[in-house]
Amino acid sequence: MKIILALLIFSAIILFHELGHFLLAKKNKIVVTEFSLGMGPRLLSTEKNGTRYSLKLLPLGGSCAMLGEDMEDESKGTFNGAPVWGRIATVAAGPVFNFILAFVFAVLIVTLVGYDPAEVTQVESSSTVAEAGLQEGDIIKEYQGYHIDLARDLYLYMYLNNPQEDETIHMTVERDGKDVELAFKPDVQVRYLLGFNRKSTDSLEVASLIPGMGLSETGVEPGDVITSINGTRLESSDDYTAYLAEHPLTSEPVTITYERDGLEYNAEVTPSESRTAVLDFSYNLAYTKTQGFEVLKYGTLEVKYMIRSTLLSLKELLTGGLGVKDLSGPVGVVDAIGSTYEASKSEGMLTIWVNMLYMAALLSANLGVMNLLPLPALDGGRLVFLIIEAIRRKPVNRQIEGMVHFAGLMVLMLLMVVVMYNDILKIF
């Protein structure tokens, strides 16, 4: 069931994208030779008014094939025979239709559950942010120059940009209908750590050591099992957590016992200081119901958030914050939709509908953004050549354009294979 649902959502998004190309092609008197859903051999096919409508074997894509699209033919009815602005509109229509579909889904989501205002719910009384004047009930409108429409905007920015100890935080909040400017430095949380990562096992097994900290300067190695601290026996990882709650580590050395190959060893460890900048306030992540024209407003803001999060993810990819292994292709998307469906079933039908609508809206907005990237073989790459043609008033050499798009297609196909391989590894 979850796979069928995922494929239906994925297919609907692709179909609507291609529908944008199709309708604008017809509007600009460009002959559409085939409008298809899926890839590979045809399963069903019919022809009407010169256009073949097809359902193909693999439900992982679609196409809107136009007459003379990849040729130099500029005769009547061909893609290149249409006015340049008509061609620009036809190519851009696919991504635009994805944004329209995302907006429709977002409006339905807001109608069902509302939106999430970035309202401050708690401020630590002794914190620097309290001294700066932040109060419960304030609505955060701007953070470090980053405009905040929804609580998720703030969460996304803070997730990608951890505050630094010497950083000055600038924040604009709305209070009693007026904007209030705040500036403060983060509080600093000082902790002492042994400097290791645990394995997700019952015993306190060392997964890895953090260079330059505590345990890395002893004889402890990954795979060793820590069995006691200062004489207190530790049977499990939970025991370690409980020990730290009762006896927080300080700069004073501690004695640990660890086991390796059935033998126990002792080591004296001096915990390492760790300083973390923290913002001692909490903000709302729950949803508030709304109605009337506000639904359209917050539906628009939902789509804006989805587009913004996609662009920020691309920025992280380019700057090294994310890698190719973090990308997902059709296989990963189908698995994510299926997993979301399974996780939502226990919460009832409303949760299932909202989560499926959200996944569909996010995917549609994501597809719109990705297709507008100025890369060969994508709609954005084709738009670059068409805009150059509009400015120069003559087309770029068709053969050169074709070779550029072909090279881009080969690179994209290779990337798709790598991403699909990673998706399969993640699943199995």
Each model region followed by its residue ranges:
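Internal alpha-helical transmembrane segments
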Residues: 54, 58-125, 407
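Functional transmembrane alpha-helices
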Residues: 78, 82, 193-217, 225, ...
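Conserved PDZ fold ligand-binding element
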Residues: 129-152, 215-238, 303
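Final/C-terminal transmembrane alpha-helix of multipass membrane proteins
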Residues: 403-423
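PDZ/PDZ-like peptide-tail recognition elements
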Residues: 88-122, 156-160, 164-210, 255-257, ...
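Alpha-helical transmembrane signal-anchor/signal-peptide segments
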Residues: 28-33, 113-131, 135
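Alpha-helical transmembrane segments of multi-pass membrane proteins
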Residues: 10-14, 65, 98, 102, ...
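Small-residue-rich helix-interface/hinge motifs
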Residues: 2-75, 370-392
